[in-house]
């Protein structure tokens, strides 16, 4: 069993719309926070990858909304590295209300490895190693349960 990486984010007043719930696009931003923090957890950053000429633009994004997040809620962001292809990688996400565990949203993003000009590249060795570490971390965390 694998375990997702977990991060938390508080819903700020500016994250909400006139109905008092989190604006829909913010869920994708929270996906990004989860993904970014997962990279940090395995010892790297997007900046470091970009400095080495590897960019990971979003190629596809999907979000299924279940329950609204509201101002001052704390969201638990669960992120899992899902797969890597020749030049693509996918991350899966679940956003949960920290206090009651309600699923707020689920989704995924697919990224393509490119150079700074947008030319598709095979994932570089460092990225492959980071993805391997993400998989190992998820398996290790899952075996502790």
What name fits each language-model region?
Residues 27-30, 55-57, 92:
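Residue-level recognition of specific faces of alpha-helices
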């Amino acid at each position: 069993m694998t375990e997702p990486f977990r991060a938390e984010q508080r819903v700020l007043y500016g994250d909400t719309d006139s109905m008092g719930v989190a604006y829909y696009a913010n869920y994708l931003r929270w996906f990004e926070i989860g993904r970014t923090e997962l990279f940090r957890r395995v010892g790297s950053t997007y900046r470091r990858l970009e400095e080495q000429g590897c960019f990971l633009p979003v190629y596809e994004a999907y979000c299924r909304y279940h329950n609204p997040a509201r101002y001052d809620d704390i969201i638990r962001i669960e992120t899992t590295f899902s797969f890597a292809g020749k030049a693509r990688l996918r991350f899966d996400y679940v956003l949960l209300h920290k206090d009651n565990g309600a699923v707020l949203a689920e989704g995924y993003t697919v990224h393509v490895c490119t150079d700074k000009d947008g030319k598709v590249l095979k994932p570089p060795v460092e990225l492959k190693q980071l993805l391997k570490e993400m998989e190992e971390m998820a398996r290790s965390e899952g075996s502790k349960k």
